[in-house]
Amino acid sequence: MSFADMVAKLRVSLALQPLITALFANSPFTEDRPNGFRSMRSNIWLHTDPDRTGMLPFAFEDGMGFERYVDYALDVPMYFVKRGDTYHDVAGADFKALLRGELPQMPGERATLSDWANHLSTIFPEVRLKRFLEMRGADMGPGAHVTALPALCAGLFYDPQALDQAAQLVRPWTADERQALRRAVPAQALDATIGGRDLRSVARDVLTIARGGLTSRGRR
């Protein structure tokens, strides 16, 4: 896959992650009582360390690429450095200082590739860029949902025409609209709105696109 393919898929997957949360919302109870949310799990992530979570608005800006994601990751505060079997608490430290050997908690210690891999594992945006795209929006559900989610993603992202249609659908949404949808979905799910449309209507369009993508790949 190409560089442009990564950017296109990252943008579409980020924009649609709240919709996926709404479709697969499945955590309305806490300790056997209604908690006021369709997806409590999604609400919890809304209130988790903003330095390492969220909708990555920079991904929609001109110049987005692997380097920009690396810059973002470098700016995320560290949790730990592992040496042997020991985890050294360096919470809040700057990874760039570790690259320079100037980490106050471990002076002279320099970053390794393992340190970088460990650091990347502590970043939890709605979609995490790895050697693949890790989409984090859906709650766990029954078996039918477990198989429906990869079918939806395959239909959207593995067929070029479907991906282009999905990109056209989400392109008019602004960063503020995407963020407002992300905030609304945990409680409202498909009753939320974006771009003057209710999310349920948008979901129908997305499912139609995904079905077309699956059909073109010989899947039904």
Feature map (PLM): residue ranges:
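C-terminal accessory/tail domains of diverse enzymes
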Residues: F3-R220
